[in-house]
């Protein structure tokens, strides 16, 4: 189990509602982005983390790329396969082959 998970999102309410119980199964503490944080601080938090569970966003992709450079083989990046409905059957083309890919979640991506 992890000691702590820090959630960075522009919709922490959705994250707490949809992911809170799941995250608490794996981490002693779940922290959510404070309302006073800045985009630069959020990016620094994500990019310097050795383990990232990202979203289908440019912000997360770049955080994962930078984490890979900083932490090398010790970096673990988990990203969803889904990106956008109108492209390539919804699958993200930006995924690094070194990342772990989540194909689906319980209830689906819209659930």
In which residue ranges do the predicted regions lie?
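N-terminal targeting/anchoring "stem" of glycan-biosynthesis enzymes
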Residues: 1-111
């Amino acid at each position: 189990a992890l000691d702590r998970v820090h959630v960075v999102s522009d919709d922490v309410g959705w994250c707490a509602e949809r992911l809170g119980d799941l995250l608490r199964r794996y981490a002693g503490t779940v922290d959510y982005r404070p309302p006073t944080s800045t985009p630069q601080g959020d990016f620094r938090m994500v990019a310097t983390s050795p383990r990232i569970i990202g979203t289908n966003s440019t912000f997360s992709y770049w955080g994962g790329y930078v984490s890979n450079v900083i932490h090398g083989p010790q970096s673990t990046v988990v990203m969803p396969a889904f990106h956008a409905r109108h492209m390539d059957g919804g699958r993200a083309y930006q995924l690094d082959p070194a990342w772990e890919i989540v194909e689906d979640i319980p209830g689906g991506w819209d659930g």
